[in-house]
Regions:
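Non-catalytic scaffold segments within catalytic domains of secreted glycoside hydrolases
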Residues: 1-162
Length: 162
């Protein structure tokens, strides 16, 4: 048995308060930094805290991160490449936090990147690109993005560092 967690973005934050429990949960402000998808606030600490809290609260022995990734405003450059530095930054920071959790004993046994290739998203259609491979939807030509190279390195070394 295992639990699968989809981890993308923080949805709220906690502040001290005079309330009985000593804290208050507030929604993320609209000005909070986000990726090209407005709903995808940048919060790599979620990759640390979500599995850590889930393991502690539910006494989990095996966790898989079943989805994590980001959209990006990917553009093919004149040299035929996609330099998606924002996605590399997102993945590097989230995976570093996940690595921190596993180093502390959180039982994360696997990670599934969303997504391998650009695809049709239910809400946004073909407008938002989540893949580490660029897809030309007219020709179906697949081109690895900079993030594909980074993620290949992550897999090869089993580490989030560059």
């Amino acid at each position: 048995d295992f639990v699968g967690l989809n981890i993308y973005a923080p949805q709220a934050y906690v502040v001290a308060s005079d309330r009985a429990q000593g804290f208050e949960v507030l929604p993320m402000p609209s000005s909070f930094p986000h990726m090209s998808s407005p709903w995808l606030q940048i919060g790599p600490e979620t990759a640390y805290w979500v599995p850590k809290l889930a393991a502690n609260i539910w006494n989990l022995k095996t966790i898989y991160i079943t989805e994590n990734g980001t959209s990006s405003d990917d553009k093919m450059t004149a040299d035929g490449k996609v330099h998606d530095l924002d996605r590399v930054m997102y993945l590097r920071n989230y995976l570093a936090q996940l690595q921190r959790a596993t180093a502390e004993g959180v039982p994360v046994k696997g990670y599934f990147l969303w997504s391998l290739m650009d695809n049709f998203e239910w809400v946004f259609g073909y407008k938002q690109r989540f893949g580490v491979y660029h897809i030309d939807f007219d020709t179906q030509v697949r081109t690895p993005k900079l993030s594909a190279s980074y993620y290949r390195h992550v897999i090869t070394t089993n580490a989030a560092s560059a």
